[in-house]
Amino acid sequence: MLKFQTVRGGLRLLGVRRSSSAPVASPNVRRLEYKPIKKVMVANRGEIAIRVFRACTELGIRTVAVYSEQDTGQMHRQKADEAYLIGRGLAPVQAYLHIPDIIKVAKENGVDAVHPGYGFLSERADFAQACQDAGVRFIGPSPEVVRKMGDKVEARAIAIAAGVPVVPGTDSPISSLHEAHEFSNTFGFPIIFKAAYGGGGRGMRVVHSYEELEENYTRAYSEALAAFGNGALFVEKFIEKPRHIEVQILGDQYGNILHLYERDCSIQRRHQKVVEIAPATHLDPQLRSRLTSDSVKLAKQVGYENAGTVEFLVDKHGKHYFIEVNSRLQVEHTVTEEITDVDLVHAQIHVSEGRSLPDLGLRQENIRINGCAIQCRVTTEDPARSFQPDTGRIEVFRSGEGMGIRLDNASAFQGAVISPHYDSLLVKVIAHGKDHPTAATKMSRALAEFRVRGVKTNIPFLQNVLNNQQFLAGTVDTQFIDENPELFQLRPAQNRAQKLLHYLGHVMVNGPTTPIPVNVSPSPVDPAVPVVPIGPPPAGFRDILLREGPEGFARAVRNHQGLLLMDTTFRDAHQSLLATRVRTHDLKKIAPYVAHNFNKLFSMENWGGATFDVAMRFLYECPWRRLQELRELIPNIPFQMLLRGANAVGYTNYPDNVVFKFCEVAKENGMDVFRVFDSLNYLPNMLLGMEAAGSAGGVVEAAISYTGDVADPSRTKYSLEYYMGLAEELVRAGTHILCIKDMAGLLKPAACTMLVSSLRDRFPDLPLHIHTHDTSGAGVAAMLACAQAGADVVDVAVDSMSGMTSQPSMGALVACTKGTPLDTEVPLERVFDYSEYWEGARGLYAAFDCTATMKSGNSDVYENEIPGGQYTNLHFQAHSMGLGSKFKEVKKAYVEANQMLGDLIKVTPSSKIVGDLAQFMVQNGLSRAEAEAQAEELSFPRSVVEFLQGYIGIPHGGFPEPFRSKVLKDLPRIEGRPGASLPPLNLKELEKDLIDRHGEEVTPEDVLSAAMYPDVFAQFKDFTATFGPLDSLNTRLFLQGPKIAEEFEVELERGKTLHIKALAVSDLNRAGQRQVFFELNGQLRSILVKDTQAMKEMHFHPKALKDVKGQIGAPMPGKVIDIKVAAGDKVAKGQPLCVLSAMKMETVVTSPMEGTIRKVHVTKDMTLEGDDLILEIE
């Protein structure tokens, strides 16, 4: 039954939750005077202070908190009835170790008793004595017992006297490294240093060899001094792979001692407990009996009173060794409370008031184990970085609760600031179940419910522990973490909502993250998506491809009656008109409509070329994800990509195995037709790309890049014979489809008729595909001429995305062929709806639209031969530099540069080379004659020099001489195919490097992105790791962020939608930040955003750049307590550079490389943030 006592302020529940026995005093024991406690002060902070306050409130006792200057915002001071500052002007830890201030607060405010909590002064006999001397009760053992038990060496002697087995070790604290040497000589390695006046893993260091002895002794001494105010150490033999079992004891002032069974604390890291379990699983009953009886025997030996813990190591043979007594409440007391139903803090207070254990209904025979309890300490430590403490502001805190879950929390709330000064504990989560697996399941569920944003936590690591089969079987020892490296295969939290808020806030404060060429806002009107029928889309040419393979697909195309169209709207059209900036978000919205209404298309060009790197570089999207998502939405129409031969989708040469692997993975992700070309029509490069695409199982479409005019007999370099000869080689190489790729739109109707009819006559069974641009305005006429001459497929873009430097109009071709033998079978009214969508979508990209400076196409393209996309770019660049009126000169220079380089075929990257040389000539006021005459002295653009060296292949007709020799002088020249001499890239090694850098699962697609664009990919991964899945934002939000008071939805995935409202942006704070407020799913959220413009005018410590080898950054926030090197010193890999201290833990920063110290950026006692630059090595 429950026993109550009337006290001031109400009823008091005695120190047991449930008891079947009435309170009876022990017989023949002198009764002490009962002195009720009316006011308790907790000389501690964080969750243990809150735990004691709650117990006091339940007992009707008034509570008093103390706090340091650094803890003014901490929750424990708010949970108490009164709170007082201590340690003014002292270091953070020293404030809670300042006995005079604590005693002064107690005496001045009528405190009856002081509860020490754990850590800090809890095991300091001088503190217990100071309380006693001041007439204030110390809720704990007597000062003498605290002294004996707190001095681990004396406690060891007492254990020996009581007949309790101990680990071989020193009899008293050691005071020199020499004594440590002597002990290791006697007992051998491994040995362990332990702080003589405290626990919790502080001051503990294991040493395995003489070489490690000095460094570990120094660190252990320093840690013990910082944590407990005394650096004394003792040393003992280290028992390998033991279980760490501790027994909870409770004594009163009448000599009654009982135990509350044991806890298993074997899951540790650096002797710091991580997960605690009660009772210990699979513990032999006889061993349990020996452990508990030895614990009671030891407590009686010293006349122990109040709560305490006796700790043991149990070796693999079941032999136990006494370690120490913690004469205080333990962090993990909670699990004992859960399985015994005894409130230990209540009991502590009652014992201090003079109550006996029998009075409280606490008899050994009544203490029973009920089920199993597990405690996890949720901390702001990053398991991926060796559990380094993280600091910062908690942006979101949502805990896991429910049946069987208890939370003992500290300052875990939204807006709380986690400092580097104290322990990193956020909350203790305790799960109680009928057995170990049940408790583990409840704990796992609760941790999965947690949402902590703004600081890193150890929750992913704890979840791995809870799911580990060895843990679930209950057979763990202290090496569990070290022997299970898979525990560190952490599944990163998605944290998508908070990351997106950070992005939106960043844009609201700093403007767009992608360069905006024209200051024009996106259209405020969202494009209307036409109605899409329910059900699967109708069959299309891809169904034929999947059924009959590439050869059968090619036959079907050739046998088709009527003209087939390829739609370039999803790639080349927006590359030409909108600087390749169209986002997956807008492509996905219209994709289902295309699938249902345009199944008669030959294919859709939607991938490859410039879209690949631009997606990562400027849109912060994964190009592979775009392909995957579009494939899912359009399963019936073949996809086509642009493959730059041996350059794949890059601008340089790659090892052959990279090109082959790229095509293989592209095919696996849904790519069908590979349009393979080379910017110089260099056959070896094209053949490699064709082989790679073919071996992947794709449709090979060899594309001959077109320039000149085959209908003009004066243009002899690129004659009909040239194209026919090249076509022969490509057909012989096994192409499934032959393409003429007219990048500048130079094909005139007469040339179309001549070239296509010749190809049709020569290759009657081969599908012919023609690509052009409409810069001149003659694109529709040219494509009709091609169709009439025998072409099977021509390229078009939907009307609102056609014309100018894009492809000819889809609607125009459909209308012109309707009712003729060339009928496309594409419904014209569906083209209108499709076009209307893109007209609206185009308005979202107004800042990138070529019409900002270009109002029409121009027939002068027949003279300058500038490809469509490049024509747009050059036109815009000229206007943005104030040279719009001189664009004519740029085009003239382009013609001259082309002739200087030997009259090239111009398509990326050769077109860029010509463009670079043209701009170089304009900027330097050079004519062709002047540039050629001064070729030996001029510093030409790098792209020009590398072209002349042979880096992109050999142009038709060879390199221009003597210009080439003048420019190159003695630079090396490449003979043959540029990539042929490159060794294979180790893709497995690259994957490992990516995992090491980005710390998450890396896909084959990621590996290939990194192989193609290593720097761009790294920046993309870093950006999205910070800002989340940006492709889920609509384009207006992506470019300019929301307006204040704007409400909107963001769909993360099917069935998961965020409701967001932008509320306000604050003024600038002293750290150069602005606070941005949102409402997310009805709850207030705020984030801090650095104002990049304002920070340029403020001084901050530099950050270490991840990509700069030799820049060493702080691995965690903390204080510099030792610098071991100076500028000019030579260092070896692994050599200590400096020592940081944070949260009472020290970390040695070591050199990752051999070199010389160039500069040291820190001084002793400097406080650093994470990644602050410490020093530079060269």
From Swiss-Prot:
Organism: Mus musculus
Tissue specificity annotation: Liver, kidney, adipose tissue, liver and brain.
Top class in the EC scheme: ligase
Cofactor descriptive note: Binds 1 Mn(2+) ion per subunit.
Reported modifications of this chain: Acetylation of Lys-316 is observed in liver mitochondria from fasted mice but not from fed mice. Acetylation of Lys-748 might play a role in catalytic activity regulation.
Modified residues (N6-acetyllysine): 35, 39, 79, 148, 152, 241, 297, 316, 319, 434, 589, 661, 717, 748, 892, 969, 988, 992, 1061, 1090, 1124
Physiological role: Pyruvate carboxylase catalyzes a 2-step reaction, involving the ATP-dependent carboxylation of the covalently attached biotin in the first step and the transfer of the carboxyl group to pyruvate in the second. Catalyzes in a tissue specific manner, the initial reactions of glucose (liver, kidney) and lipid (adipose tissue, liver, brain) synthesis from pyruvate.
Protein name: Pyruvate carboxylase, mitochondrial
NCBIfam families: PRK09282.1, PRK12999.1, pyruv_carbox
GO biological-process terms attached to the record: gluconeogenesis; glyceraldehyde-3-phosphate biosynthetic process; lipid metabolic process
Cofactor(s) this protein cannot do without: biotin; Mn(2+)
GO molecular function, one term: metal ion binding
Main location (coarse class): mitochondrion
Cysteines paired by S-S bonds: none
Domain Biotin carboxylation: 36-486
Binding site for Mn(2+): D572, K741, H771, H773
Post-translational modification N6-succinyllysine, affected residues: K79, K442, K988
Gene that encodes the chain: Pc
Transit peptide feature, positions: 1-20
